Every structure is written in C-alpha cells, then in structure tokens.
Amino acid sequence: CZAADKEDDPNFFKMVEGFFDRGASIVEDKLVEGLRTRQSMEQRRHRVRGILRIIKPCNHVLSVSFPIKRDDGZWEVIEGYRAQHSHQRTPCKGGIRYSLDVSVDEVKALASLMTYKCAVVDVPFGGAKAGVKINPKNYTDEDLEKITRRFTMELAKKGFIGPGVDVPAPNMSTGEREMSWIADTYASTIGHYDINAHACVTKPGISQGGIHGRISATGRGLFGHIENFIENASYMSILGMTPGFGDKTFAVQGFGNVGLHSMRYLHRFGAKCVAVGEFDGSIWNPDGIDPKELEDYKLQHGTIMGFPKAQKLEGSILETDCDILIPAASEKQLTKANAHKVKAKIIAEGANGPTTPQADKIFLERNIMVIPDLYLNAGGVTVSAFZZKNLNHVSYGRLTFKYERDSNYHLLMSVQESLERKFGKHGGTIPVVPTAEFQDRISGASEKDIVHSGLAYTMERSARQIMRTAMKYNLGLDLRTAAYVNAIEKVFKVYNEAGLTFT
C-alpha cells in the first residue's frame, strides 16, 4: 500500500525526469541516425546517450538562509533556493515563487520544465527557478520588500542573477512589484554601471522597463494554445467534439494571473465558464460565470466565495462536468486517485506539473487530450524573450507609429485621387475611407499589438511542430511526449554542435 501511495505521489523532479526519459527513448534512434560523423554506430550511440545524460540533471542549485528584522521587532531566518537546470542557452530564465511548499526538489523540477518549455517554443533561454519559503500573507509589505531585496543580494553574491546570466520573473505570489524591487536592488548595487541592469528581471512595472502585454501573456498564450488544437478537426473528431469554442464549457482551478486571463479570453471567444476553484473553495453556475464580475468581486472581498451569481461547489472542481478543465494552481493535482473521475475531454495544464505520470496514463487510456504544461503555459516566457531581447531600449513600434499612420493615409488618398481622375464626373469626389478593421490598424502597431502578434505566431508554429511529431511517432493524443521529443531534439542539437568545453 505504501509503495502504491508513493507511485501516485511521485517526487516532482523525478516525475519530470520520467517524462523526459519517455521522450528520450522515442527519439534516441533518430538522434543516432542524424549524426553526420565517421564514427561507428556504437560510438554515435554512446555520444547520443552521453548528451542525453548531460541534458537531464540540474547544473546548479543554490540554497541560502538569511536573517531579516520584521516590522514588529522579531528576528527571522528566511530560506530560499535558485536552481539553474541548463546553460545550453543563456541567460537562464525562470520565475520566483513565495510559498511554504517551496523545496529544493520543487525548484529543480520547475527549472527543468523551463528548459524544455523554452525549447518547445524556440526561446533562447536555459531553464531556472527560484523559491522563497514563506507565506507572503503573514508579512507586511515592508517585510516583503526586505525579504525580496535581501534575496536579490544573496543571488547576486553567488552569480545567480544578471542580464546575461540568470533572469528571474514573477511566479506564484510574486508580481510586478517584486520584480521592480529586484531590478532596483540589482541596478543600485552591482549593476550600477550596466545600461542593461534592469533586464536582470522580466515583467517589472512599465516605468521600470517592462513591456506592454506581459501581464496577460501566459493567460493569452494558454488560450491561443488551446485554440490551435480545438480548431483542429482531426483532434476534435478523435474526442467526439466539434471544432471551435462556441459550444464548449470550461472550469478553472486557480483564479490567479493565469486563471483569470485564460478565463477572460475563453469567455470572449464564446466558451462558457461553469466553475472556478481557489484554495478556500469553489463556485459553479451552469449558466456561466462572468470573469470581469468575478474579478471585481474578488478584488473587493479578497475571495471568490460568496459570489452572488454562483453557488458553492460541493466536491472537487477537477471532477466538474465540463468540456475543458484548466488546472492553473499547483503541481500534482491530477493523480491516480481522481483521474477516473475527471469528466472533461480536454485538460489544459495552466500550472506546472499538475498531472502525475499515473494520471497521464489513465487520461490516454480514457481518450482524454492533455495539452501539456511545457507547451501550454509558455506564453509568459515567450513575451519575456521579447522584453529581454529588446536591445534598443525603445518600446516596440514607438519609432514607426506616426510614419505608418501617415503612410496609410497617403495610400488611401492616392487611391481616391486615381479613382476621381478616372471615374469622377465634373470633379466630383469619390471618398475612399478605411474599414473599421483597417481603422484599428491604421495608426501602426502598438507595442501590445506587436507582442500579441509575435506570441500568436510562436503558438501556431509550436503547435504545428507538436502535431507533426505526434503523427510521425504515432503518439495519438500523447501530446506531452511529442512536446518532450521536440524539446529534447532542440536542446540536443545545441549541445552536439557546441561540443564539450573540457573532456
């Protein structure tokens, strides 16, 4: 019985390594065949297996303990961690979370997921993750600022933060505020001579060098990734569903940044949210829940419970009767114990690692599509890449706004004058006016437009790659393995072509 319990509640990092091993076993032969060398087949296989062993573990893990003096005069020692999984691309990239559940195992698992996530969407970062072992609700804003700034200095002392080295981002219980504190701390100390110092984080406030469109990026990306599969007639026929969002219902576990924005976009495109779950309870309404109304209620009351246009949900939100289930809370929520009770036909992993290997196996047997975390929630790191790679220090589009607008109006005027010369009678005018859609674009692309466009392109391209891989290896609905295969191929190529520094 104890062994069975352990199997259903695996070590998080071992869980990710297990998914990696599954993908590696499928792609190994192809990697061996693809090596263009004079080596024997045995030597090539040794090389491939050696590189796969290099990819798998975490390269560096930092554990720190530091004291703070709280506002009430009490002294406290804070624990924090930062894991860098891979340096095949730099800087390393990954969020910082504040939670009592933070552990070395968790940050290693999340860092490794970041490596594969970046590879899946072709973002040139290595994977990293950090965590501070606190419950932020138990601290004042002043205490949190002290903790954040001190943790930044601990990272800096060990070379675990910097624009070209390691770039944190928000995660659970952190946001623009914390990123701005980190950026200011770094820029005011060891980065004070570096023009790129504020690029030591992504998603600070706009005034601190942030980018428009980053706040909603993960949620928007989640919607776009779901859209790429839900609009695919072949996959929908396998599930016995019709393409499109119009007649679909969905439930969201977690009403944070990812849950809220994914709910907004799905609602906007015609899907109906029937249930929302948080740590203190869940609500449901078969007629639908409006995301804006629920957001306003939570901002006012600090909870979704008691929302007047829904009733309390008895039982688990993961077992809600819906078409699309979005677990956007924390890891290992879908397990062997509840996988048979899930009624959704599509599981969209908004959180990192919400599905255990045993549950994943059950979903495949039950013909349930799982759109995996390393693809689905990569919208945030994709837009972070746009922010990080903006080397000009100028908002995207700012230099071309007026020129594009004037050029568009000159084009319309030229068409109008040509028509009047050809068809106009007695000098009459033939007005040429933009359509409503063109009018929206006529001023040129704003930074947010450019970010959304780049994000959409990335989502579509990554989805096509996963679909092709799933078809190539006859994986059916096993999109997770297809995504891991893609990630492994790309990371392998970097290591193989770069070679090893010292052997």
Curated annotation (Swiss-Prot):
In alphabetical order, the GO MF annotations are:
ATP binding; glutamate dehydrogenase (NAD+) activity; glutamate dehydrogenase (NADP+) activity; glutamate dehydrogenase [NAD(P)+] activity; GTP binding
What SUPFAM superfamilies does UniProt report for this protein, alphabetically?
Answer: Aminoacid dehydrogenase-like, N-terminal domain, NAD(P)-binding Rossmann-fold domains
Q: Which residues form a coiled coil?
A: none
Question: What EC designation does it have?
Answer: 1.4.1.3
**Does the keyword field hold Mitochondrion?**
yes
How its function is modulated: the record gives: Subject to allosteric regulation. Activated by ADP. Inhibited by GTP and ATP.
List, alphabetically, the Gene3D superfamilies matched.
Answer: 1.10.287.140, Leucine Dehydrogenase, chain A, domain 1 (3.40.50.10860), NAD(P)-binding Rossmann-like Domain (3.40.50.720)
Signal peptide extent: none
Report the locations given in the UniProt record: Mitochondrion; Endoplasmic reticulum
Q: Name one Pfam family in it.
A: ELFV_dehydrog
Q: Which GO terms describe its biological process?
A: glutamate catabolic process; glutamine metabolic process; tricarboxylic acid metabolic process
Specify which residues bind substrate according to the UniProt entry for this protein. K93, K117, S384
Indicate whether ATP-binding appears among the record's keywords: yes
**Keywords (A to Z) from UniProt:** ATP-binding, Endoplasmic reticulum, GTP-binding, Mitochondrion, NADP, Nucleotide-binding, Oxidoreductase
Q: Where is the active site?
A: K129
Reaction catalysis annotation? L-glutamate + NAD(+) + H2O = 2-oxoglutarate + NH4(+) + NADH + H(+); L-glutamate + NADP(+) + H2O = 2-oxoglutarate + NH4(+) + NADPH + H(+)
Positions that bind GTP = H212, S216, Y265, R268
Q: Where does NAD(+) bind?
A: H87, Q88, R89, D122, H198, K389
Q: Which residues bind ADP?
A: S395, R461
The top EC class, named as a word, is oxidoreductase
Family according to the record: Belongs to the Glu/Leu/Phe/Val dehydrogenases family.
Function field: Mitochondrial glutamate dehydrogenase that converts L-glutamate into alpha-ketoglutarate. Plays a key role in glutamine anaplerosis by producing alpha-ketoglutarate, an important intermediate in the tricarboxylic acid cycle.
**Subunit details:** Homohexamer.
Q: What is this protein called?
A: Glutamate dehydrogenase 1, mitochondrial
Could you tell me which species this protein originates from?
Answer: Gallus gallus
